From Swiss-Prot:
Biological function: ATP-binding RNA helicase involved in the biogenesis of 60S ribosomal subunits and is required for the normal formation of 25S and 5.8S rRNAs.
GO biological process, one term: rRNA processing
Region annotation Disordered: where it falls in the sequence: 1-51, 638-674, 857-935
Top-level division of the source organism's lineage: Eukaryota
Motif mapping: DEAD box: 240-243
Organism classification: Eukaryota, Fungi, Dikarya, Ascomycota, Pezizomycotina
Protein's name in the database: ATP-dependent RNA helicase dbp10
């Protein structure tokens, strides 16, 4: 038998996939045709020239050779001609099709974002997902890429297979753009259903059997009820920015839509935050969802440094200006980017060369990779605070942008883009508006209004100190906010440093450091604010509105814990609370600290005698004896209360101790404190207990504390009786060890993210509305007072937008507006002569599909058919007008058909026309030659 070939045949893994990736590409074809002339001879693999005749029967050597060749082929990027192959870990490793990879490369995506890297593999495994991601983090591609991969191509069976619900028209348009760009290599049909567009055109689109529907909940529910749509064919559902969907009042629409979806669908829910109402919705509408949350969103960066400034309520505006001027060193006037744009020549701005320059500059300047040291976000409580702070900071000369929940989507996009591009250094926002904004170039965060929950604080400051960069957060803390500061300190598990009680040795990244601002600079800024409020009536009016909004915000925000409220009284009453913050460590701040101490001593001075006792020496004892007795009684009462409070404070740690450690009955003559401590010292330790408890083992500690608890004299008979349980055979229902977290981690079905309810408990966070309105799911009154009719009316009609109109019950039982069943779809079918609509699962009708293609192409149908006009009626008043119209129509038809009148009226005259023209000309000449009548 002849020996086989020296090198093994090429395996399928070594197949060149360039043609599959870039087929039907004009650019790649041109590159290949131009490269044919310059093609170099293919390099030989060195191992192919080796002699393998001696290793014919060596299978291990062949396997090693094949593995080596495959490894080298996968490692070298030169095998793909004309293209650059990305390293592993990108989109190529996710098992996507060639057309989709080509569309992703054309879109400019090279490396998936963190949310895409975590979400796409889970979605490809047909699991329901709850993803927490902000706008700008790539979440749109995170659910569009798997959707296109799953749907692949257009289905001739009737029924949409993908549904994406967005809260606004603008966001739906952005999603449609991404779907069209990523689905370029497929024949998937996508429609957009938003309010404001013609219902008849949307009827045509839905009748043409689209594959993907991108819609707002209100318009989609309208079409569902009007057209009686069957949603049983939908396999892929996405709720984009679900928190905004609930916030904008789409809860009833979402419930009705969710009721009509099939149970075997795959549901994805993306949101910037996870309120409690959204958790309940996810548990009801999703099947065993997986919570995907980035680690950077749930913890504070170790590179973040925090500073907390204790201020008074009347000093908040001045403190904000002082931080911007003195701490951050924020420049006033236009920013550098704004100056560059202003410096461009207006005449040459629209030239082609300058356009090319600006385009290249915008591509070169990547906003995500060019942070500035002055980019700052200021968090305020309500939208009224945002308006007020924007006007105040703009008056101070800063470049400011602002965003709040009720702002128009276009205006919101413009304001955020100005901040991202560097046209403004400060962005004033509310928690509700900022939850969906992803700004990776942030350097500073200022909490103008202190957050009411530690999770909200982490959500705010988590936007800075990313990717190894340093960042600062500055918080203004009033006396009323001190309990929330202590809650935050306990949540973070860090040391609380107030003022300079520990000297200058503090770590702003590991400690919660609080203190006051320098009085001189703060007073100057407060005086400037007072002057502006006196001069500008508009800003003063905005401050009045913000004050009223703050009262409502204080009433509706969460309350702090009771223990933190008790501790806050002691912290606020201490002298260190108002002392200079350790952040200011220069010589002037030291002098300011000494000045504050002197003022505190002067302010805390209390004379030894009251005015009544001083007057005794002047007037006499007889006249002031009654006043002196009153003062003595008050002073005695106060001294007794002080002693009692000290005794209670010292004996607090003995409340839970055994009675053997408390005061003995036979030592009543001693003081309470002395007796307690003497008894504690006289009690002998139990047998076998070591003096040094830090060196005791676990078993010794168990014996020690068990005998320690059994030494109590007031034991019950049940506890003192011998136990019937035999330790050799009895199995306890409670675990013997305390490492429950370790046992849960080893469980197959009890991992960190397997239980959505448990995983979402740490991620749940409710944000207060920035307009004072209650969020979805919060309790509210069902009735309201109608001033016009002088009676209580139902509030539900105001919430669903029907304003007292008639409501009907939907399929899910929820009330929907009766205007959804208006009969316009039946009129559209009669007008378009459409009979029975095909049902879900049937083959699509070709005429309806053609109508959809025409609607998607953007070209509207125009009536071009010409018919003979009706004969004019002599009895009508417009007979002459209609007759002329009919004559003109006949002339046009004759010109099109050809003949005597083809191409318009003939210019050639016959003999009759010439004779008539000569007569008219002769008459004119005779008339002009007549002599005048005056002669």
């Amino acid at each position: 038998m002849a020996p086989r070939a020296a090198s093994p045949a090429l395996s399928e893994n070594e197949f060149d996939i360039t043609g599959a990736l870039f087929q039907n590409d004009s650019e790649s074809d041109n590159e290949r045709s131009s490269a044919k002339s310059k093609r170099q001879p293919k390099k030989k693999i060195p191992s192919q020239d080796l002699d393998f005749l001696g290793d014919v029967n060596d299978d291990d050597g062949d396997e090693a050779f094949i593995a080596q060749q495959q490894t080298s082929a996968n490692r070298k990027a030169s095998n793909l001609k004309g293209r650059t192959v990305k390293k592993g870990g990108g989109f190529q490793a996710m098992g996507l099709s060639a057309n989709l990879l080509k569309a992703i490369a054309r879109k400019g995506f090279s490396v998936p974002t963190p949310i895409q890297r975590k979400t796409i593999p889970v979605i490809m495994d047909d699991q329901d997902v709850v993803g927490m991601a902000r706008t700008g983090s790539g979440k749109t591609a995170a659910f569009v890429i798997p959707m296109i991969e799953k749907l692949r191509s257009h289905s001739t069976k009737v029924g949409a297979r993908g549904l994406i619900l967005s809260p606004s028209r603008e966001l739906a348009l952005q999603t449609l753009k991404v779907v069209k760009e990523l689905g370029k290599g497929t024949d998937l049909k996508c429609v957009l259903l938003v309010g404001g567009d013609s219902l008849e055109e949307q009827f045509t689109m839905m009748a043409g059997n689209p594959d993907i529907v991108i819609a707002t909940p209100g318009r989609f529910l309208h079409l569902k009820v009007e057209m009686n749509l069957d949603l049983y064919s939908i396999r892929y559902v996405v709720f984009d920015e679900a928190d905004r969907l609930f916030e904008m009042g789409f809860a009833a629409q979402l419930t009705e839509i969710l009721h009509g979806l099939p149970p075997n669908r795959q549901t994805l829910l993306f949101s910037a935050t996870l309120p409690k109402s959204l958790v309940e919705f996810a548990r009801a509408g999703l099947q065993e969802p997986t919570l995907i949350r980035l680690d950077t969103e749930s913890k504070i960066s170790p590179d973040l440094q925090n500073a907390f400034f204790s201020i008074k309520s009347s000093e908040k505006e001045g403190a904000l200006l002082y931080i911007l001027h003195e701490v951050i060193k924020m420049p006033t006037g236009p920013t550098e980017m704004a100056q560059q744009r202003q410096g461009e020549d207006a005449s040459a701005r629209f030239s082609k060369a300058n356009k090319r320059k600006r385009a290249e500059m915008e591509k070169a300047v990547n906003t995500k990779e060019s942070p500035t040291q002055h980019s700052t976000i200021v968090f305020a409580a309500t939208k009224h605070h945002v308006d007020y702070l924007y006007s105040l900071l703009h008056e101070a000369g800063f470049a400011v942008s602002y965003v709040y929940g009720a702002l128009d989507q276009t205006a919101r996009k413009i304001q955020v883009q100005n901040f991202r591009s560097g046209l403004s250094n400060i962005l004033v926002v509310t928690d509700v508006a900022a939850r969906g904004i992803d700004i990776p170039i942030l350097a500073n965060v200022i909490n103008y209004d202190f957050p009411s929950q530690p999770k909200i604080f982490i959500h705010r400051v988590g936007r800075t100190a990313r990717a190894g960069r340093k960042g600062w957060s500055y918080s203004l803390v009033r006396d009323a906010d001190a309990p929330y500061l202590l809650d935050l300190q306990l949540f973070l598990g860090r040391r609380l440093v107030v003022g300079r009680e520990n000297g200058d040795h503090v770590n702003f990244a590991e400690d919660v450091v609080a203190g006051g601002l320098p009085r001189d600079g703060l007073s100057q800024n407060c005086e400037w604010v007072t002057k502006v409020l006196g001069d500008d009536a508009d800003i003063a009016a905005q401050r009045t509105v913000a004050t009223k909004g703050e009262k409502l915000y204080m009433r509706t925000r969460n309350s702090a814990s009771l223990e933190s409220a008790k501790r806050a009284k002691q912290v606020v009453s201490s002298d260190h609370w108002t002392s200079i913050h350790p952040l200011f460590q220069d010589e002037s701040s030291n002098l300011e600290a000494e000045r504050e101490k002197m003022l505190a001593r002067i302010g805390g001075y209390r004379p030894s005698e009251t005015i009544f006792e001083v007057n005794t020496r002047r007037i006499g004892k007889q006249e002031s004896e009654e006043a002196l007795n009153t003062i003595k009684r008050v002073r005695t009462t106060l001294e007794t209360k002080k002693k009692r409070s000290k005794a209670n404070a010292k004996s607090e740690f003995l409340e839970d101790a055994p009675e053997g450690l408390k005061t003995g009955e036979g030592e009543a003559g001693k003081n309470e404190d002395e007796a307690a401590f003497s008894d504690a010292d006289d009690i002998d330790a139990p047998t076998g207990v070591a003096d040094d408890m830090s060196l005791a083992s676990d078993s010794e500690l168990e014996v020690t504390f068990s005998s320690y608890s059994q030494s109590n004299g007031n034991k019950s008979k049940k506890a003192s009786a011998a136990s019937f349980q035999n330790p050799d055979y009895f199995m306890s229902y409670t675990p013997n060890n305390n490492s429950l977290a370790e046992d849960r981690a080893y469980g197959v079905h009890s991992g960190t993210n397997s239980n959505f309810a448990q995983a979402s408990r740490s991620a749940t966070m409710d944000l207060a509305g920035d307009e004072g309105s209650r969020g979805f799911g919060e309790p509210r009154t069902m009735m309201r007072w109608d001033k016009r009719h002088k009676k209580y009316v139902a509030r539900q009609n105001d919430e669903d937008g029907s304003k007292g109109t008639r409501l009907v019950r939907g399929e899910s039982g929820a009330k929907i507006a009766s205007s959804f069943r208006s009969g316009r779809f039946d009129a559209w079918k009669r007008g378009n002569r459409v009979g029975r609509m095909p049902r879900v699962g049937e083959a699509e009708a070709p005429n309806l599909a053609a109508g959809l293609n025409a609607a998607l192409s953007g070209k509207r149908f125009k009536h071009r058919r010409e018919q003979a006009p009706k004969r004019a009626d002599p009895l009508r008043g417009d007979y002459e007008k209609m007759k002329k119209k009919a004559d003109k129509a006949k002339e046009r038809s004759m010109s099109k058909a050809g003949g005597a009148a083809a191409g318009g009226k003939s210019e050639l005259r016959n003999t009759d026309d010439i004779r008539i023209a000569r007569k008219l000309k002769q008459r004119r000449q005779e008339k002009n030659a007549r002599p005048s009548r005056k002669r």
